A protein has these predicted regions:
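Transmembrane alpha-helical segments in integral membrane proteins
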Residues: 75-94, 267-283
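Terminal transmembrane helical anchor/hairpin motif
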Residues: 41-61, 65, 184, 188-276
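Helix-loop-helix units of permease transmembrane domains in multi-pass membrane transporters
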Residues: 11, 85-121
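Secretory targeting signals
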Residues: 35-87, 113-181, 213-216
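Aromatic- and glycine-rich beta-strand/loop motifs that create alpha-glucan
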Residues: 1-28
């Protein structure tokens, strides 16, 4: 069996295994609840707009901000799901001896790790795209608002999920399954908070505080990709009504799209951390 076929086979098995775990039921339940609550909330926005309590511009602005808020909820659900799937998938099999029995066959450790990574990426990205598209349809049906760049925004959310699960996979080669998930989600939350702090610093003209967000987005690109996704979901008029660049102080608006250089850095980050995961797994005593 060629290496490429081995990787694809392991990816398919990983995807099948992930679909049978209880965490999938939790993800589906949380997603359904969030979509239902958001549908009710957006219907209220539509009702207020119909009663002339809100102008059409205010309704679009409100829908834009609420959509970013709900999408952050989806990204958090995806972060929790993928982080706690990545740990048991690798370190759990290592502790139980399953990995040793698989690697006893002519299968390289790098192929095993890459296959599991590919399967988890397909799972996490698929969840984000399906849930995000469903949410966009809910918003369109209730308040007649469609994001300006939904495909690019959903792709960036899938990229955010890929970054986080790559980190979780690296951690799972060194620590226990639970610890790897906790650390990955903790870093995800810390980076988001640092991004909010940096945005506030930028709106106040404080370069030192603004640098906190800039550095955090370079160390872990999840918040940078999230802000790029927000820019694709939000209505362009939202920036004008919130004062242009000063909108960075608001956690659910993004002042500018991502640069090609940052996207290249995010790809390079995944490659580097993935390489570290392969190196760590190859040296791990099974």
């Amino acid at each position: 069996m060629t290496t490429a076929r081995t990787v694809l086979t392991i990816a398919a098995l990983t995807l099948q295994e992930a679909s049978r775990r209880r965490v999938l039921l939790a993800l589906v339940a949380l997603t359904v609840v969030l979509i239902a609550l958001s549908a009710w909330g957006f219907s209220r926005v539509a009702a207020e707009s119909g009663d002339a309590t809100l102008t059409s511009g205010e309704a679009r602005l409100t829908a834009s901000i609420l959509l970013n808020l709900v999408m952050f909820g989806f990204s958090l659900i995806a972060a929790l799901g993928t982080a706690f799937l990545a740990g048991p998938t690798l370190s759990g099999e290592t502790e139980s001896g399953i990995a040793l029995s698989v690697l006893a066959r002519p299968i390289r450790r790098s192929a095993l790790l890459l296959g599991k990574w590919l399967g988890l990426v397909a799972f996490g990205s698929g969840f984000v795209v399906v849930a995000g598209l469903a949410q966009c349809l809910v918003v369109w049906a209730t308040v007649d608002y469609w994001p300006p760049q939904p495909a690019a925004a959903l792709a960036l959310l899938a990229g955010q999920t890929t970054v986080l699960l790559t980190l979780a996979l690296l951690l799972s080669t060194a620590v226990s399954p639970m610890a790897s998930g906790v650390v990955a989600v903790g870093l995800f939350g810390t980076t988001w908070i640092a991004g909010v702090v940096g945005g506030i610093g930028g709106s106040l003209g404080n370069e030192a505080v603004e640098r906190v967000g800039t550095v955090s987005r370079m160390l872990l690109p999840t918040d940078g990709l999230w802000r790029g996704a927000m820019h694709g979901f939000q209505d362009p008029s939202a920036l004008v009504q919130f004062g242009g660049a000063d909108s960075e102080a608001f956690p659910f608006l993004s002042a500018a799209p991502l640069t090609p250089g940052y996207l290249l850095w995010a790809v390079a980050w995944v490659v580097m951390v993935g390489g570290l995961a392969v190196t760590s797994f190859q040296r791990k005593d099974l």
